[in-house]
């Protein structure tokens, strides 16, 4: 039976689908023979072949013929890509050092710039440079060399992706200035990039000190002295601030000069931005923490970009640096120049340098009553602003030796002066150094303690004269009756010495009696009474005796008038019978009175004791020859004079 040109069966016999499968044996892409009739092809159902995708090669078509296998492969690739992104986001070792820095002022002025900030992961950086480098698998197997760089916006701030999508917008990509020429990449670094590299330094202060010397030609340490503590206060401060925004720098001097007596500022530009160097004298003293906090807020910079130290006050090169810098056009100066700059830069001051004179220093210490080494050193150094000899003392390298010599000479002068005076002259000399008070509180206290004033004055007169057997007075009584207060106030007025039985184990515990006008032994106990009964009978008599002195030979002295206080009344104990004739005893039986505010009812001070001795000078026989003649003694002078030498 001849083949029919078409199919009339309803799909039971040969069909168009059967014809397609029959033609599968032919190679795909073979050209159709021209001998075949186009009409036969259309009738055979070959017009349906356009429904099959022949764009894939035969091998791939065979492998992906299974639709479920293709879906599995696509899901696996998608999961691997997501896992790679997560690894790059959370396992990246790179952490930006700027992420914790304070925001720039540009971020406060522009919301769009505020949204652009540097992230902590490497994910955004790789996404940002996917145009200039090939994307690898994320496992480091790619052989393509890539370059990782920090990218910045046109405003100098670091750029990062915003949101969680990790995509870079078109506007942000336009802000990146990157030109790739083969393997060489050109990047235009802004001041913010330089600060990022600065923060990566291990020793930030060393980097800042080096940059300062590069900009100004002098080390920061040459202009300042070091304060180890941040709590130390000072009125003068030198500070250098790095990476300041130029818009803030314009009004800084105007804002700060309201708080300062003197302000010297100069700005310098570098690759890190604007650098500020300033010398400021505040109206009140400030510590370093306060100054750093103030500058950080005013200039909008982190604390670690600020160097703050007090200036060198005794350095002529440092003073000359500020003097010359203030004369230039690059500095802005307001206020009165500090005296330490003016004195070290004036020609008159340089020519007027004098040689130190120990005699002038000794005379000053004697006139002001300084005998302690610490007081002499401290107060004389403060006179360097008004005394040329004190300024020469500060410039000397032998300050400690001069202080020791000065204190030693003052003690010798004072001791000789005291020994030359009689007791009446000494009391008058001490009274001239204090004000006039009221003698009545002392008399009222003695009456309050039931002491006969006439008997007490008679004993006090003999005590001051140092009459043998009358050279020691003891005040006894219960605790809190005012015995020590009464005795200590008298010793303070007469500048007497205090000895203590606690030092009795030393051979030199009585050495201070050799250089005293009067002396006091407070709170004599039973053991001390026993020691005095055994070893100090001759001393209590007021007769000459010998005492041991440290690093000196034995000295024969007459014991000065000695005042004792004790809770033990030796007149009521027979075992102290040998001391009863040597000690005059007065008893304080009543507690010392105080008012409702806790103040003493009977005030005992130098002014009241001065009035007491002046009032009762005739009864105590304290009249001096100078009082009768009306002569006034002049203060001694210990300075070299002009001696006329004759031929």
Swiss-Prot record:
Q: What class of enzyme is it?
A: isomerase
**E.C. number(s) listed in UniProt:** 5.6.2.4
Question: Which residues of this UniProt protein bind ATP?
Answer: 477-484
Bias (Basic and acidic residues) ranges: 146-158
Q: Which residues carry this modification: Phosphoserine?
A: 92, 96, 110
Record GO cellular component, one term: host cell nucleus
**GO terms for MF:** ATP binding; ATP hydrolysis activity; DNA binding; DNA helicase activity
Q: What is its main location?
A: host cell
Q: Where is this region: DNA-binding region?
A: 187-353
List the signal peptide residues.
none
User: What does the entry give for GO biological process?
Assistant: DNA replication
- Where on this chain is Nuclear localization signal (motif)? 87-89
Fill in the PTM field for this protein: Phosphorylated.
Pfam families, sorted: PPV_E1_C (PF00519), PPV_E1_DBD (PF20450), PPV_E1_N (PF00524)
Localization terms from the record: Host nucleus
The chemistry this enzyme catalyses reads:
Couples ATP hydrolysis with the unwinding of duplex DNA by translocating in the 3'-5' direction; ATP + H2O = ADP + phosphate + H(+)
Q: Where is this region: Disordered?
A: 139-167
Q: Which UniProt keywords apply?
A: ATP-binding, DNA replication, DNA-binding, Early protein, Helicase, Host nucleus, Hydrolase, Isomerase, Isopeptide bond, Nucleotide-binding, Phosphoprotein, Ubl conjugation
Chain positions of motif Nuclear export signal = 109-118
Domain (SF3 helicase) spans 451-601
Subunit (UniProt): Can form hexamers. Interacts with E2 protein; this interaction increases E1 DNA binding specificity. Interacts with host DNA polymerase subunit POLA2. Interacts with host single stranded DNA-binding protein RPA1. Interacts with host TOP1; this interaction stimulates the enzymatic activity of TOP1.
Entry's family note = Belongs to the papillomaviridae E1 protein family.
Q: What does this protein do?
A: ATP-dependent DNA 3'-5' helicase required for initiation of viral DNA replication. It forms a complex with the viral E2 protein. The E1-E2 complex binds to the replication origin which contains binding sites for both proteins. During the initial step, a dimer of E1 interacts with a dimer of protein E2 leading to a complex that binds the viral origin of replication with high specificity. Then, a second dimer of E1 displaces the E2 dimer in an ATP-dependent manner to form the E1 tetramer.
Q: What is this protein called?
A: Replication protein E1
State the organism of origin: Human papillomavirus 40
The gene that this protein is the product of is E1
